[in-house]
Amino acid sequence: MDSPSTTASGWIDEHHQGVRYGLQGRVLVDEKSPYQRITVIDSSRYGKGLLLDGCWMTAEHQERHYHESLVHPALCSAAQLERVLVIGGGDGGTARECLRYQDVKHLDMVEIDGRVVELSQKHLPSIGGHAWSDARLQLNLEDGIAWTANATDSSYDVILVDGSDPTGPAEGLFNEAFFKQCRRILRPGGVFATQSESPEAFRQIHIDTVRLIRQVFGYADPLYGWVPMYPSGWWSWTFAAVDGPRYRNPLPARAAAISSGCEIWSPRWQQGAFEAIPAFIERELT
């Protein structure tokens, strides 16, 4: 959809396949960038939030459900953390969680839409937090697909894809050619991760994405959690590696250093989230 609907009673809704997902609030910004429609809202429940092309992306009071789930299984398990690549993530939340690790020496954030970054910094500053002023962060306002294609072999220890749904500028982040480039530029012992849609609202996209990543990397597994403002509230992230499912085993020292500052993630939560694969999806992937 192109823009959220706003009712007379102040509800801002996302519509998906005959179901409405809404928050009560008011629109602060609604504009069109060269890539997508960007809407910033102020809701009574989740604080300020961001929508792209009418689809909920993040909000101040529930963003940790998404960002911690994407980041920590990868960064707690990769062999090294010196160089990290984040594709998308213009709200800054993924970069913020990555930069909590002192072993990260350089983080490339590649975001195609600079207006998302500007509006997030202005209206949602708590999500990016100190990441925007961290000297280790290099913000690149470029196409993430082209960035991976042009990167040198084995140049990143962790690659995180924090993109929107597979339409518009994010469509190319879900195909085989892109995943192969990510594998090429991943260092030995590295971990790749991407958001992989809802197993309920986007069932076939989710299954196809996990299957394709597994074919490209050799090892890949979905992790399941919840993001209350997303379609169905049930979401997934898929993790991959070429040398075994290392993403399932957080390194104790890293986990101990990071978990006390987390709202959602812990080694115990992660174990359950990987094991929570529905039977019908497990059959499809076998």
Swiss-Prot record:
GO terms for biological process, alphabetical: spermidine biosynthetic process
Domain PABS: 9-242
Enzyme Commission number: 2.5.1.16
Subcellular location: Cytoplasm
Enzyme class: transferase
Pathway terms, separated by semicolons: Amine and polyamine biosynthesis; spermidine biosynthesis; spermidine from putrescine: step 1/1
Cellular component annotations (GO), alphabetically ordered: cytoplasm
Stored SUPFAM superfamilies: S-adenosyl-L-methionine-dependent methyltransferases
Keywords tagged on the record: Cytoplasm, Polyamine biosynthesis, Spermidine biosynthesis, Transferase
Catalytic residues (positions): D162 (proton acceptor)
MF-aspect GO terms: spermidine synthase activity
Keyword Transmembrane helix: no
Catalysed reaction, written as an equation: S-adenosyl 3-(methylsulfanyl)propylamine + putrescine = S-methyl-5'-thioadenosine + spermidine + H(+)
Family in the record: Belongs to the spermidine/spermine synthase family.
Task of the protein: Catalyzes the irreversible transfer of a propylamine group from the amino donor S-adenosylmethioninamine (decarboxy-AdoMet) to putrescine (1,4-diaminobutane) to yield spermidine.
Protein name: Polyamine aminopropyltransferase
Organism: Prochlorococcus marinus (strain MIT 9303)
Organism lineage: Bacteria, Bacillati, Cyanobacteriota, Cyanophyceae, Synechococcales
